[in-house]
Every structure is written in structure tokens, then in C-alpha cells.
Design a protein with these regions (language model features):
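Alpha-helical transmembrane segments and their immediate juxtamembrane cytosolic regions
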Residues: 1-212
């Protein structure tokens, strides 16, 4: 619970920063239109809720389990329908604010999002068998990063998979996964919570200052 709360609260703060770039922080947007859109922590928060749901289902707590699995998966479609159904600017502003902060939606996230939710669930479901887990991960990579992309953008050529649609390269993660011995390494958990947001905004500030 503490781990989830840390991830979630940081994701809310970073989501609020991103929302401000879209709505009130125009002067801080780089002249070429770029600004940080890093919401990986929001992706993790959504995934953790879904995984908790699978755990509850495994313990036959079906009500809360199915709710925890289905709500994070389906909520973006509900929010999108609510946005489409109304042109009220205050209502739309509120829905956008909630979607960037306290109620993140996987379909709206540029950094991770739906892919993180999908891959996280696949890894969790096959967690009891290392080799089956890795095979499932590789198959999901092929289907999501190659087959899906070809269906969505049929005009892609081979070079595009190295310059535009390069997400398939996460297949190479199979190598360290095979080498992992299953034990937790040394590290400072507090360092991560500071480093992740700080390095993003420091690097952005430098790029903003040096931009020509």
C-alpha cells in the first residue's frame, strides 16, 4: 500500500505539471512546442490497481477483484464518451484535469499507458514460470509492437521500424530477463522517488535554456 501511494502521489504531481503545460504554463513550453509528457508513474499506478484486482480474484474476492481489473481498463472509454457528449468548457476542463492527475487514463498517457498495462498484466499472469513468462512477453511484443503497428500503418517500410516504430526493440529485454536470478538487488528506494521526476525537469530546463 505504501509503495502504491508513493507511486500514485508522484504521478498526480507530475500529471499536474503536464496539465499546466497544456493549459496555463505556455511561457514554459519550449519554442518548438516540446514539453515533458512523462507519465510512466501514472501507468504504474493504473497497473498496480489492476494487479491487485487479479490478486483479489485469485483469493475469490470477486466483487472488488473484478472492479479493480475492469475499471482501470474501461474507464478511458467512459471518460472519452463523457467528453464527446458535452461541449461545456468547464466540464471538459474538469475531466481533463482529473484524467491528468487523480484519475489517470491509460489511453491518454504518452509514456507507457496502454502498453504498460498490457505487458504488466502478461508478466503477472505468467509469473510462476520464468520461461513461459518470457515467451509470453516476446509474443506480446511481436503482436503489439509489430503486427498491430503494421495493421495501423500498412505503408511502413523496414527502415521505419528503426526510426519511427522502434518500440519492438523492447524484445531485447528478453536477454536480461533470462539472466535475472530472481533475487532483489541493492539500491535506495528513496533515491528513485527523487531522481525520476527531478532528472526529467532538470534536463528539460537545460534544453529550454539552450534551445536555439
Amino acid at each position: 500500500r505504501k509503495y502504491f501511494l508513493r507511486i500514485y502521489l508522484l504521478s498526480v504531481l507530475m500529471g499536474a505539471v503536464q496539465f499546466s503545460f497544456y493549459n496555463i504554463g505556455f511561457a514554459l513550453v519550449r519554442p518548438d512546442g516540446f514539453f515533458p509528457q512523462n507519465q510512466m508513474l501514472a501507468s504504474f499506478a493504473i497497473l498496480l490497481v489492476a494487479l491487485q484486482g487479479f490478486d483479489w480474484c485469485a483469493r475469490k474476492k470477486w466483487g472488488r477483484g473484478l472492479a479493480a481489473v475492469l475499471i482501470p481498463i474501461l474507464s478511458p472509454f467512459i471518460v472519452s464518451a463523457l467528453m464527446t457528449a458535452s461541449s461545456n468548457p468547464i466540464w471538459l476542463f474538469t475531466l481533463n484535469l482529473l484524467s491528468f492527475t487523480v484519475l489517470p487514463q491509460h489511453l491518454f498517457i504518452m509514456d507507457g499507458g496502454t502498453a504498460t498495462l498490457l505487458f504488466g498484466i502478461v508478466l503477472y499472469l505468467f509469473r510462476k514460470n520464468r520461461y513461459l513468462q518470457i515467451a509470453a512477453f516476446a509474443l506480446t511484443c511481436v503482436l503489439w509492437d509489430i503486427a498491430r503497428v503494421l495493421l495501423m500503418m500498412p505503408g511502413l517500410c523496414l527502415s521505419d521500424f528503426f526510426t519511427v516504430a522502434y518500440e519492438w526493440m523492447e524484445l531485447f529485454a528478453v536477454v536480461p530477463m533470462l539472466c535475472y536470478n530472481g533475487t532483489k538487488g541493492r539500491g535506495s528506494k528513496r533515491f528513485f522517488y527523487w531522481f525520476y521526476p527531478v532528472h526529467i525537469y532538470v534536463l528539460y530546463a537545460l534544453s529550454f535554456a539552450l534551445y536555439r
